[in-house]
């Protein structure tokens, strides 16, 4: 993968397995740092109801609200998530910078590891990365099992310890 050294550095900084970070990058963006995706359902559920969204100069309030509901960069970090993790830049598209996107993606992955790994292992952490929490359906599979399976495939079917 083109950004292997940056992936290894970001993973190491957050005590994450580099192979896992590389697998998430592969599934999320296919290694394209300029990948972005507006997620209207996220906007409707999490951004639109929050009247407190402030504009980050020189960005308009409306632009900021749209950017919060967009996933950015190699790890497809949601703008709102990046802000909650301390991103202060005026424009959330800065997350398309490979090092910046990896930093915030790994911050999130490390936070989810600390919260969910003991109960769900890496599959639970990965499910939470994609869906916010490792929710399971009535059949005992993750609600986003196909995402978890895609990451597992990128890992060659072997989860890190």
Where are each of the predicted segments found?
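Catalytic glycan-binding domains that act on GlcNAc-containing polysaccharides
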Residues: 1-161
């Amino acid at each position: 993968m083109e950004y292997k050294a940056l992936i290894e550095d970001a993973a190491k900084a957050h005590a994450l397995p580099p192979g896992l970070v590389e697998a998430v990058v592969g599934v999320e963006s296919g290694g394209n740092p300029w990948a972005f995706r507006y997620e209207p359902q996220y906007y409707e559920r999490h951004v639109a109801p929050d009247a407190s969204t402030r504009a980050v100069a020189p960005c308009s309030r409306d632009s900021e609200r749209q950017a919060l509901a967009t996933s950015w960069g190699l790890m497809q970090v949601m703008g709102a998530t990046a802000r909650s993790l301390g991103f202060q830049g005026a424009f959330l598209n800065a997350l398309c910078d490979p090092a910046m996107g990896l930093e915030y993606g790994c911050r999130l992955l490390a936070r989810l590891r600390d919260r969910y790994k003991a109960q769900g292992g890496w599959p639970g952490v990965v499910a939470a990365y994609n869906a916010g929490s490792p929710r399971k359906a009535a059949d005992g599979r993750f609600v986003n099992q196909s995402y978890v399976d895609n990451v597992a495939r990128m890992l060659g079917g072997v989860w890190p310890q």
